[in-house]
């Protein structure tokens, strides 16, 4: 990911297993919070947008267009964060976005992960639509943990034991 140091410049940093683990730990907490708040606060229009994005995600899986898949996945999460109605949470998540984006593609390119992601998103939307706060929180956390597990498997199946 890109690191900017004032008066020193910008460079692309190597990302370690520890960095990945830390990013996913933070993201699991933040997405869990956002999903729970969204279950309480989402509008019908936002819910409709999430459902439309799920359909688009499936269509792009069929064509194998990874650029569009990542674009739709990012839009899905953005709607979820906006639906939380918590500007500070959204700001914190946006600060992580560049780091998440730099590793997301690798996780999503793992065999079967795209379909798993679509199913996990569907489950999350179902809980949000039902206004099930706890279900939404659990689904969001599970989705992020599954993405982390897949990423670690894609890096090296022998190093993944659930903890780094």
Predicted regions mapped to residue ranges:
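ATP/adenylate-binding site constellation spanning eukaryotic-like Ser/Thr protein kinases
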Residues: 7, 17, 74, 86, ...
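Amphipathic alpha-helical effector-binding/dimerization core
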Residues: 20, 71-75, 83-89
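Amphipathic alpha-helical interaction elements
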Residues: 39, 58, 81-85, 129
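Amphipathic alpha-helical dimerization/coiled-coil segments
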Residues: 33-62, 71
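Residue-level detector of well-ordered alpha-helical segments, enriched
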Residues: 46-49, 68, 72, 88, ...
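C-terminal all-alpha effector/ligand-binding and dimerization domain
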Residues: 51-58, 63, 75, 98, ...
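Short linear motifs at protein or domain termini
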Residues: 1-40, 45, 82, 148-164
């Amino acid at each position: 990911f890109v690191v900017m140091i004032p008066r020193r410049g910008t460079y692309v940093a190597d990302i370690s297993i520890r960095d990945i683990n830390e990013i996913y730990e933070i993201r699991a907490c933040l997405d869990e919070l956002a999903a729970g708040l969204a279950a309480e606060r989402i509008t019908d229009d936002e819910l409709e947008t999430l459902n439309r994005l799920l359909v688009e995600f499936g269509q792009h899986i069929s064509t194998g267009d990874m650029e569009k898949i990542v674009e739709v996945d990012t839009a899905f999460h953005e709607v979820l964060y906006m639906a939380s109605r918590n500007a500070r949470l959204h700001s914190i998540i946006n600060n992580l976005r560049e780091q998440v984006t730099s590793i997301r593609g690798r996780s999503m390119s793992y065999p079967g992960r795209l379909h798993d992601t679509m199913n996990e998103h569907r489950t999350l939307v179902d809980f949000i639509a039902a206004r099930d706060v706890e279900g939404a929180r659990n689904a969001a956390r599970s989705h992020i943990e599954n993405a982390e597990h897949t990423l670690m498997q894609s890096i090296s199946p022998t190093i993944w034991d659930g903890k780094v």
